[in-house]
Regions:
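Bacterial N-terminal signal peptides that target proteins for export
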Residues: 1-11
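Alpha-helical transmembrane segments
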Residues: 14-18
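C-terminal motif of bacterial Sec signal peptides marking the signal peptidase cleavage site
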Residues: 19-23
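Exported/periplasmic ABC-transporter solute-binding proteins
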Residues: 25-68, 72-271
Length: 271
């Protein structure tokens, strides 16, 4: 009887272990989760779609929470790969995070299509956002109070824009919005608004103006002549290896095979 009970116990433990192993090797092992920058939506969405098409049974997810949230998510183990539209800060690197530049993206300065202004210098943009220039007539436009639209604190797009224009902690925003899409929609609906957004996400509902005579485009970002640009970064942990599926995705998106997909999505591949 004791031998029988012992055998039953061993079988029960074995069954439990098998169930656990199956759970670990099931859907979670065949999935890739990303979290972060809303500016990277078009690029990462296209890459995820291509990866799923080439790998039957694999699930790819993207959570558009913003760069700061995506960095926190990977640091806390809540996703496989974080997405940031800015370089990591020293304190983030000190947490054991590492970054890989996936692509480069222009930050387009956008206005309503009805606005006659088509070019501003970097200095004028800084003066507008810090409240030194408040009316469009001061920069060759129609008479109208300038409405400043920007992103929320923690946004990689905001960090890049303010760093390049030298306006950190000095912008006089009317609205601070939580996504690239919201900025574009708001500027499209207000003739006096100005905003900034990922070049890869800009639609014909707004007008991307030139900066210092240089229009934002893939070619001007690539040759460096367009002044307001930043990296699209993949964030991972140094001390935690990716799952086989997540590593396969990482290798795919950073390979030469992904360059055309990234380009078609409006960014400039880093490799």
């Amino acid at each position: 009887m004791k031998i029988f009970r012992k055998s039953i116990a061993i079988m029960a433990v074995a069954a439990l272990l098998a169930a656990v192993l199956c759970a670990c090797g099931g859907q979670s092992a065949q999935s890739v989760s990303t979290d972060g920058s809303t500016s990277m939506e078009k690029v990462i969405g296209a890459l995820g779609e291509a990866f799923e098409a080439e790998n039957s049974g694999v699930s790819f997810t993207y959570n558009p929470t913003g760069s700061g949230s995506g960095i926190a998510a990977v640091a806390e183990g809540r996703c496989d790969i974080g997405l940031s539209s800015r370089s990591l800060k020293d304190e983030e690197l000190a947490q054991g995070l590492q970054q890989t530049v996936l692509a480069y993206d222009g930050i387009a300065v956008i206005v309503n299509p009805e606005n006659p202004v088509s070019d501003l210098t970097l200095e004028q943009i800084a003066q507008i956002y810090t409240g030194q220039i408040t009316n469009w007539s001061e920069v060759g436009g129609s008479d109208g109070q300038i409405v400043l639209i920007g992103r929320e604190a923690g946004s990689g797009t905001r960090d890049g824009f303010e760093s390049i224009t030298g306006t950190e902690d000095a912008c006089q925003y009317r609205q601070e919005l939580t996504s690239t899409g919201d900025v574009i929609t708001t500027v499209a609906g207000n003739p006096n608004a100005i905003g900034y957004a990922s070049l890869a996400a800009v639609k014909d509902t707004v007008k991307a103006i030139s900066v210092g005579g240089v229009a934002p485009s893939e070619s001007t970002v690539k040759d460096g002549s367009y002044a307001i640009q930043r990296p699209f970064v993949l964030v991972t942990r140094q001390d935690t290896p990716l799952s086989d599926t997540a590593q396969k995705f990482f290798d795919f998106v950073t390979s030469a095979d992904a360059s055309q997909i990234i380009s078609d999505a409006g960014a400039v591949a880093a490799n």
